[in-house]
Regions:
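Extended active-site and interfacial segments that coordinate phosphate-rich ligands
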Residues: 114-136, 204-206, 212-214, 219-241, ...
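Intrinsically disordered, low-complexity segments enriched in small/flexible residues
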Residues: 2-107, 111-118, 245-264, 269-386, ...
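A SIS-like phosphosugar-recognition module
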Residues: 157, 167, 350, 357-438
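Short coil/turn connectors at secondary-structure junctions
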Residues: 93, 103-107, 138-142, 179-184, ...
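Short glycine-/small-residue-rich flexible loop motifs, especially phosphate/cofactor-binding loops
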Residues: 52-53, 133, 174, 197, ...
Length: 438
């Protein structure tokens, strides 16, 4: 497609940027070392727990194998890979999540990490799940669970269930998304008692593997129910004997119950891959916009290679860099239509194209600003990266205009914060900063 609306505005934006003066091997090496460090941390967390071979030998796929089978090749973008607010020993919240494209349609995907204690709920997992549902709600795209959750880790359950953003909040959020018309799908694997059971039942479309189950309580609870109302030594010994020597209590809530009788589960499959294919099918039924509808120009590469960023952005945070050179290596054709360039010089705002789509850009300029800000007098020297009165006003205006026209914003944030002191208070920076929040 080559015919678009308003070409004089969107296809003829000014070009910015210039070639770099030359490579900076030391800076590049330091940045790549930092990238490698993060990559190693993420890989270590994903590898922790039961081995892939051990799970595969039982006919199960791992969380990442299920994700790769579900999303289009090359279209998986992890989110919050290092998020571990409670400091769990394995470095994670026992879920893997991210944005993925499924048959060309975007979705938020959350997979129970069955390598780690059968995907049990651990402290911090609820908050991580809410981040996923927040993303689905904001973008209005499907939320898909690949669920394999053995309930809560009992020795820390007091840190899992309580609070308004604790264990029950994700189930409320699933209901909220359904009311908003945002689809919530789940593929159910393994044993899912208690918190795992509610997690199974709260989405709107349920598909499952034939050996999966979901229940209010698991076999441990069934085996432990005694009329005394308390556990003494005699009861404890009987429980141990029943678990080690006696007949096993069948796991409640099998697919014979929840597919054949209750009808909660729509479809059942004999292997993990079948569940994945069913989820793909239901995603394909959903309406979706063609991106061509939103494009303002044909997609094209930036005029300068992204690899230049290793030379442009210094590892030493005391060294200024030219953020225009960064913008020139991120957006189509290195084109950028700036908004109010001479006003609020510590902030750069404007329009650019990304894959032919119109986006707003907000960035912190890095430089000394002579005789600025104006409220500090003629001899003032402002520092790039700090927020002053004019920059806050410009940002507020630009963000408001983008919100009005439903233009997404790319924010290149590199700031030391807002200006402080009585001159800043008299210049109303507190109120101007608040205007960005609402």
């Amino acid at each position: 497609m080559s015919e678009y609306s308003m070409p004089r505005y969107f296809q003829n934006m000014p070009e910015i940027g210039e070639p770099t003066y030359g490579p900076d091997p030391e800076n590049e090496q330091q940045l790549k070392a930092t990238e490698a460090e993060f990559k190693e941390l993420i890989e270590k967390i994903l590898a922790a727990g039961r081995s892939d071979e051990s799970l595969n030998s039982t006919g199960q796929l791992t969380a990442m194998q299920r994700i790769r089978a579900l999303v289009d090749e090359g279209c998986w973008y992890p989110l919050n890979s290092l998020y571990n607010p409670a400091g769990n020993a394995n470095g994670s919240t026992n879920i893997v999540k991210g944005l993925g494209r499924i048959g060309g349609r975007w979705a938020v995907v959350v997979a129970s990490d069955n390598k780690k204690a059968a995907g049990v709920w651990v402290p911090g997992q609820s908050e991580n799940l809410l981040r996923a549902s927040d993303t689905a709600k904001t973008l209005r795209i499907p939320l898909i669970y690949l669920l394999n959750c053995a309930g809560a880790q009992l020795d820390v359950q007091e840190k899992v269930y309580p609070n308004r953003r604790g264990g029950g909040a994700p189930f409320y959020r699933n209901a909220e998304l359904a009311q908003l018309g945002v689809p919530v799908f789940v593929g159910i694997y393994g044993t899912n008692p208690a918190g795992g059971g509610y997690h199974s039942i709260s989405p709107t479309v349920l598909v499952a593997r034939d050996n999966a189950n979901m229940a209010v309580g698991g076999t441990g609870i069934l085996s432990g129910m005694k009329p005394k109302g308390y556990v003494d030594q005699e009861t404890a010994e009987a429980l141990i004997k029943a678990q080690t020597e006696g007949p096993k209590v069948p796991a409640p809530g099998s697919m014979n119950v929840h597919h054949d009788i209750t009808g909660f589960v729509r479809e059942v499959y004999p292997d993990d891959q079948g569940v994945v294919e069913a989820l793909k099918k239901y995603v394909s039924y959903l309406p979706a916009y063609n991106l061509e509808y939103f494009r303002v120009a044909d997609p094209c590469e930036p005029a300068y290679p992204a690899s230049d960023l290793y030379d442009i952005i210094p590892t030493d945070q005391k060294i200024f860099y030219d953020v225009y050179q960064v913008i020139a290596r991120l957006f189509d054709g290195s084109c950028f239509q700036e908004y109010k360039k001479s006003y609020g010089p510590e902030m750069i705002t404007g329009l650019a194209r990304l894959d032919g789509l119109l986006v707003g850009v907000v960035a912190n300029k890095q430089d000394f600003l002579m005789n600025y800000p104006e409220y500090r007098g003629e001899d003032a020297i402002g520092v790039g990266g700090k927020l002053y009165r004019q920059g806050l006003i410009k940002m507020s205006e630009f963000v408001t205009l983008c919100a009005r026209d439903r233009i997404p914003i790319v924010w290149l944030q590199d700031t030391s914060g807002i200006d402080v002191g009585d001159p800043a208070e008299k210049a109303e920076l507190l109120g101007l900063g608040q205007s960005l929040i609402y």
